[in-house]
From Swiss-Prot:
Its EC number is 2.5.1.75. The record marks 101, 123 as: Interaction with substrate tRNA. Its cofactor is Mg(2+). It comes from Legionella pneumophila (strain Paris). Catalyzes the transfer of a dimethylallyl group onto the adenine at position 37 in tRNAs that read codons beginning with uridine, leading to the formation of N6-(dimethylallyl)adenosine (i(6)A). GO terms for biological process: tRNA modification. This is tRNA dimethylallyltransferase. The lineage of its organism: Bacteria, Pseudomonadati, Pseudomonadota, Gammaproteobacteria, Legionellales. Substrate binds at residues 12-17. It comes from the Bacteria. It holds the Pfam family IPPT. The gene is miaA. Residues 35-38, 159-163, 240-245 are annotated as: Interaction with substrate tRNA. ATP binds at residues 10-17.
Length: 313
C-alpha cells in the first residue's frame, strides 16, 4: 500500500469533486488537484473550484498556487505532485489525484519526455506564419502532421499549437510520439478511476446548466475583478480556461451576451470531448458511468477491494 496512488479522472462536469469529498469519508485519502485552471488565485467561479465548505471538509493541494499572470507547466506539476505523494504516504495516508487535465495525468504516470528546448528562430518563423496565414491555418497543418496531438488541444490554444509544431520542425518527430514513447516512470502504482458518462446528451446538459449557474453566481464580475487587479491579456495561459476568453471578448464588445454564453458552453463541451478522447484510450483504467445511480457505491467497493488485496499481499 505504501506506493499506491489513486487517480479520479473524468471530463468537466462529470461529478469528480463531489465524489472525491465523499471518498474522504471512507478512506485515508489526501486530495491533490490535477487541474490546470484551479491552480490560479482569484479564479473561482469559472474554474468550478470546490466551495469553501467542501475545502474545509476535504482540503485540496495544488489549488490557488499561481497568480493569473503566471504560467505552470506539466513538468512543474509532476515535481509538485510527486513531492506531495511522498509526503502523504509518509504520513500513512493515500494520495488521491482528482481532476481533468489529462496531460498532467499522462506526464505524471508515463514520465516526461526529453523534449527539445525552445528555439527562438523556429518560434519566430511560426509567429510570422501565424500573422500572415492565421492560427487556424497552423492548427490545420498540425492536424495533418500530428492528428493525435491536434485532437487533444483546442484550435485556439496558440501556445500549444506553436510548441507541437516547433517539436516537429526541430526533431522530425511528432509531440504525440514523444508523449507515448518509453520514459522513466515514477515509482508508484497508479489506480485510475475514470468517470465516463455514456450519454453525451446528459453531460452536455450538465455543462450548459453549470455554465448558466456560473453566470448567475457572478462569473462576469469575477473576470472584471481580474482585469482590475491584474494586467490580464487574452493570450495568458490562465485566460485559455474555458469561459474566461469568451467573457473577455464579451467585455471588449466583440460578442453580445447570448453569443458569449453560447460560445462558452460550446468551448466547455469541446473540452469535455478532448478529455473523453484521452480517457477512451487510457490503458488499464476502470470506467464508471457517473449518470448511473449507485456508481459511487461501486467505486467505493472497488477501492476497498484493491486496498484489502494490497494489505493481504
Amino acid at each position: 500500500m505504501n506506493k499506491l496512488v489513486f487517480c479520479l479522472m473524468g471530463p468537466t462536469a462529470s461529478g469528480k469533486t463531489g465524489l472525491a469529498c465523499e471518498l474522504l469519508t471512507h478512506f485515508p485519502f489526501e486530495i491533490i488537484s490535477v487541474d490546470s485552471a484551479m491552480i490560479y488565485r482569484d479564479m473561482n467561479i469559472g474554474t468550478a473550484k470546490p466551495s469553501i465548505h467542501e475545502l474545509q471538509r476535504a482540503p485540496h493541494y495544488l489549488i490557488d498556487i499561481k497568480d493569473p499572470v503566471e504560467s505552470y507547466s506539466a513538468a512543474q506539476f509532476c515535481t509538485d505532485a510527486l513531492s506531495l505523494c511522498a509526503e502523504i504516504i509518509k504520513r500513512g495516508n493515500i494520495p488521491l489525484l482528482v481532476g481533468g487535465t489529462m496531460m498532467y495525468f499522462n506526464a505524471l504516470q508515463k514520465g516526461l519526455a526529453t523534449l527539445p528546448e525552445a528555439d527562438e528562430a523556429v518560434r519566430k518563423r511560426l509567429e510570422e506564419e501565424a500573422l500572415s496565414q492565421g492560427w487556424d491555418f497552423l492548427y490545420q497543418k498540425l492536424s495533418q502532421l500530428d492528428p493525435v496531438t491536434a485532437a487533444r488541444i483546442h484550435a485556439h490554444d496558440t501556445q500549444r499549437i506553436q510548441r507541437a509544431l516547433e517539436v516537429y520542425y526541430l526533431t522530425g518527430s511528432t509531440l504525440s510520439t514523444y508523449l507515448t514513447g518509453p520514459h522513466v516512470q515514477p515509482d508508484y502504482y497508479f489506480v485510475n478511476l475514470a468517470l465516463f458518462p455514456e450519454q453525451r446528451s446528459w453531460l452536455h446538459e450538465r455543462i450548459a446548466q453549470r455554465f448558466d449557474a456560473m453566470l448567475s453566481e457572478g462569473f462576469i464580475e469575477e473576470v472584471q475583478q481580474l482585469q482590475a487587479k491584474w494586467p490580464i491579456q487574452i493570450n495568458l495561459p490562465s485566460m485559455r480556461c474555458v469561459g474566461y476568453r469568451q467573457i473577455l471578448e464579451y467585455l471588449a464588445g466583440h460578442y453580445d451576451y447570448e453569443t458569449m454564453r453560447e460560445k462558452g458552453i460550446a468551448a466547455t463541451r469541446q473540452l469535455a470531448k478532448r478529455q473523453l478522447t484521452w480517457l477512451r484510450h487510457w490503458e488499464g483504467a476502470l470506467f464508471y458511468d457517473s449518470q448511473n445511480v449507485g456508481f459511487n457505491i461501486d467505486i467505493i467497493a472497488k477501492i476497498r477491494e484493491i486496498l484489502d488485496n494490497t494489505v493481504s499481499n
